[in-house]
From Swiss-Prot:
Family membership noted in the UniProt record: Belongs to the bZIP family. Maf subfamily.
Subunit relationships: Homodimer or heterodimer.
Post-translational events: Sumoylation at Lys-14 is required for active transcriptional repression.
Region ranges (Leucine-zipper): 79-93
GO terms classed as biological process: regulation of epidermal cell differentiation; regulation of transcription by RNA polymerase II
Principal subcellular localization: nucleus
InterPro entries: bZIP, bZIP_Maf, bZIP_sf, TF_DNA-bd_sf, Transcription_factor_Maf_fam
Position of the Glycyl lysine isopeptide (Lys-Gly) (interchain with G-Cter in SUMO) cross-link: K14
Region (Basic motif): 53-76
Protein name stated in the entry: Transcription factor MafG
One GO CC term on file: nucleus
């Protein structure tokens, strides 16, 4: 005979003396092989066999559900970790992007300053200044300026922005 005890999680399946065993716990019922289960079921009534098999199926499903929950929680934690890492990377890339935009703007304004300076020099001819360096530099040609003066202008404009 079977005696289900619904209040106790470790349900014991009791048998009549003289059968294959005296009792089975939930853990034993779940962990035993089908062959072992069939040996224990010999001599029991059809109703008791159905109850034991149903109980075993229920317990196994409960175990599968528990492992599924653990797996789901683990996957959720892993996904949250990946999400946090990706958010950090997005923030880092956004910061790099902003920095590069600022650098690009600075380079663009330097470029525009150089263009404006080149236009100014091209429109108005430079009159040579007579001094000790004039003869060594050669004749000054309109539209051509020494590189150092261009760099000086660009640097001074950049320093003014800082």
């Amino acid at each position: 005979m079977t005696t289900p005890n619904k209040g106790n999680k470790a349900l014991k399946v009791k048998r009549e003396p003289g059968e294959n065993g005296t009792s089975l716990t939930d853990e034993e019922l779940v962990t035993m092989s089908v062959r072992e289960l069939n040996q224990h079921l010999r001599g029991l009534s059809k109703e008791e066999i159905i109850q034991l098999k149903q109980r075993r199926r229920t317990l196994k499903n409960r175990g599968y559900a528990a492992s599924c929950r653990v797996k789901r929680v683990t996957q959720k934690e892993e996904l949250e970790k990946q999400k946090a890492e990706l958010q950090q990377e997005v923030e880092k890339l956004a910061s790099e992007n902003a920095s590069m935009k600022m650098e690009l703007d600075a380079l663009r304004s330097k470029y525009e300053a150089l263009q404006n300076f080149a236009r100014t020099v091209a429109r108005s001819p430079v009159t040579p200044v007579r001094g000790p360096l004039t003869s060594s530099m050669g004749p000054l040609v309109p539209g051509k300026v020494a590189t150092t003066s261009v760099i000086t202008i660009v640097k001074s404009k950049t320093d003014a922005r800082s």
